[in-house]
Amino acid sequence: MTAGSRSVPVRYPKTRRVRFPFGTDRQYGKYFVNDDSVFSHFVAGLSGAFPPGEEAFIRSVRVFSDRITDPDLKKRVAGFIGQESMHGQEHRRLNDKLIAMGYRIGWGDSKAMERRRLRFEQLISPLAHLAMTAAAEHYTAVLAERVLSLDEIQAIPGDDAVWHLLNWHALEELEHKSVAFDVYRSVGGGETTRIAVMAALIALTLPLVATTLTLSLAGDRQARRHPLRVVREARALFGGPLFRGLMGDLAKYLRPGFHPDDIDTDALLRRWQQELFGAEGALVEYVR
């Protein structure tokens, strides 16, 4: 496979059946990421959005399964679906814990919201839905690369199981970052739609994140009692390593002829595959 001028070997995403220790006996502080109310609500919101979002990604790819003729791409799609399914399963287990702690994230995974998502998917074309998935996969790949490559982020204190979940999820997002994109191209998806969809998503990103985060914090009585702390932590989050320069990295997708594998994350993948799943990997004990 060739991405731009870079030759990339065919990689098959591996479905790892991981189960993290999110049992009822595991105790967390209220603000489980660095005792930071804003960052904790942000991570909780992301975790709440992942399971239904990834199910939508799977649906968008599956609808084209009978039009995928390349056996390598078929195998990559199977790995993509397996990985996304496992992500949803483990995030739901974490979400149950977070909801019990008072985080209001259950609405996004409710039956009512599922019906609305399915109605929306029926209103748009399958190709537009797939273009949305390809664009969203670039989002997650950009965030994943930051999480795994920046020492500033890895140094943030937090619960070990939560960090293991995030690192595992990030690793696998990089492993399958180009699958939906390649399906989109293989079934005739064009550049105009691809770029327009991403431009719209970029425009909506910060307003949507800011709004949902504000609503989440507004429902937190403890956070409401400390508004100056919330403002300080919000400035640190949006001015910090996760968001700094984010729009520029997302905008690479808008270049005509762009391919996700133009961004070389091979060395980062090898490093984290070894750190998490090597002989003494941090997650070996969680693999079933």
What residue ranges belong to the model's regions?
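Non-heme di-metal
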Residues: T2-R288
